[in-house]
Structure formats: structure tokens, C-alpha cells
Amino acid sequence: MDIKEVREYLPHRYPFLLIDRVLNIEPGKRIEALKNVTINEPFFNGHFPEEPIMPGVLIIEAMAQAAGILGFVTENKKPSDGYIYLLVGTDKARFKRQVVPGDTLHLFAEYVVIKRNIIKFTCEAQVDGKTVASAEMLVAEQKV
């Protein structure tokens, strides 16, 4: 899925669109997406100018966006149909390594269960095959 199609499944736009490409998606199962981290990211101006590190909360957001795409594809819906997914909870969030300019962030999400329009995902972010962050995420479908 290229960036044009990614934009069909996510309502986010610059500077908050954190998915560049989807490499693999199995509806109802899993997704693998990419975020190319460059020095031009606006958050590096303040986090930290001399030693730029991607903020952990933005890694969480990138994993949530990958999970959102998986949710939309699984449910056969798009934001243009009048739906969005909201991040309503995270559990077991862990940060193991820093993400810096030049890294390619591989984002994985697995669909666990859906109950009352809330989907649970397990998510992981990797750089060079090494885990940099992981979390369980809850997203809720909302009609807009």
C-alpha cells in the first residue's frame, strides 16, 4: 500500500501522518508498515536539537496508526465513509532503544479481539530487526 492509499485509510496529515508505506496486511490478523525517520521531522527541532531522538509517544502513535489501518481494512471502512478510530488505551508500553534520524521504523500490529466496537491490538516497532518499542493498544470506532 503506497502513501496515496495510506492517506485513504488514515485521517492524519502532515506533520502527524506517521506511516509512509504498508508492506503487508492480512485483514483480521496483522499489518507491517514503515516510517522513514528523517532529520527533517519537525519534532527533532526540540527533541533534542543536539542529539535528536524520536519521542516515545510518537512511536506509540505510529504503532496506533498502523493498527488503525488494520482496523479499517478488517472492517471494510474508511474515514471517507464517516468513521475514525480513536486510541482509547495503551497497556504494557515499553521502550527498549532510541530511534534517530536515518532509521527505518518497521511497525507491526496484530488484531487480538473486538468487543463493543473496541479493538485490541498487540504492537511492536523495530529498527534493523531489533525491538525499539512495544505495547498493547485499544482503539474505538467512532462515527463522525
UniProtKB/Swiss-Prot annotation:
GO terms for biological process: fatty acid biosynthetic process; lipid A biosynthetic process. This is 3-hydroxyacyl-[acyl-carrier-protein] dehydratase FabZ. Involved in unsaturated fatty acids biosynthesis. Catalyzes the dehydration of short chain beta-hydroxyacyl-ACPs and long chain saturated and unsaturated beta-hydroxyacyl-ACPs. Belongs to the thioester dehydratase family. FabZ subfamily. GO terms for molecular function: (3R)-hydroxyacyl-[acyl-carrier-protein] dehydratase activity. It holds the Pfam family FabA. Keywords: Cytoplasm, Lipid A biosynthesis, Lipid biosynthesis, Lipid metabolism, Lyase. It is an enzyme of class 4 (lyase). It catalyses: a (3R)-hydroxyacyl-[ACP] = a (2E)-enoyl-[ACP] + H2O. The active site is at residue 47. The keyword DNA repair does not apply. It comes from Alcanivorax borkumensis (strain ATCC 700651 / DSM 11573 / NCIMB 13689 / SK2). It is found in: Cytoplasm. The keyword Transmembrane does not apply. Its main location: cytoplasm. Gene3D superfamilies: Hotdog Thioesterase. Its EC number is 4.2.1.59. GO terms for cellular component: cytoplasm; membrane. Disulfide bonds: none annotated.
